[in-house]
UniProtKB/Swiss-Prot annotation:
Residues 60-98 are annotated as: FliD binding. Belongs to the FliT family. Pfam families: FliT. Dual-function protein that regulates the transcription of class 2 flagellar operons and that also acts as an export chaperone for the filament-capping protein FliD. As a transcriptional regulator, acts as an anti-FlhDC factor; it directly binds FlhC, thus inhibiting the binding of the FlhC/FlhD complex to class 2 promoters, resulting in decreased expression of class 2 flagellar operons. As a chaperone, effects FliD transition to the membrane by preventing its premature polymerization, and by directing it to the export apparatus. NCBIfam families: PRK10548.1. It is found in: Cytoplasm, Cytosol. The keyword Chaperone applies. The gene is fliT. This is Flagellar protein FliT. Gene3D superfamilies: Flagellar protein flit. Keywords: Bacterial flagellum biogenesis, Chaperone, Cytoplasm, Repressor, Transcription, Transcription regulation. It comes from Yersinia pestis. GO terms for cellular component: cytosol. The lineage of its organism: Bacteria, Pseudomonadati, Pseudomonadota, Gammaproteobacteria, Enterobacterales.
Length: 120
């Protein structure tokens, strides 16, 4: 029974970490999300090692199934938010590249006092 309680507690820790990661992704705190991800991955690895030998009780399996379902839902939402961020960063890189090309083009004309995007 103590092993089962320990396993349940490990899954709860993973769920708590995934909820924290989801919150960080929701508020776009990407640096903290990356930092927390290492802790999350270690917890998943440790729990996987425990789970292999411990999961025999049907009641425990159902409790773990519920936690896993929530963890997976959080993972899906985190990935969606990360993809949205990646798309936004790609758009910004594209805009920056286009702006640099325009500035280089207009910078070739010596009579141009200002480059596009500059103010007097």
């Amino acid at each position: 029974m103590e092993r089962h309680q320990h396993l349940l507690s490990e899954y709860q820790q993973i769920l708590t970490l995934s909820e924290q990661m989801l919150m960080l992704a929701t508020v776009e705190n990407w640096n903290a999300l990356v930092d927390l991800e290492m802790t999350y991955l270690k917890a998943v690895e440790n729990t996987a090692n425990i789970t292999i030998s411990s999961c025999t009780s049907p009641v425990l399996q159902e409790l773990l199934r519920q936690k896993l379902r929530s963890i997976l839902e959080n993972e899906i939402e985190i990935k969606r938010l990360l993809q949205r961020r990646l798309d936004k960063l790609s758009e910004l890189v594209g805009q920056s590249t286009r702006q640099q090309a325009v500035n280089r083009t207009y910078g070739q004309f010596p009579d141009q006092a200002l480059l596009l995007g500059e103010t007097q």
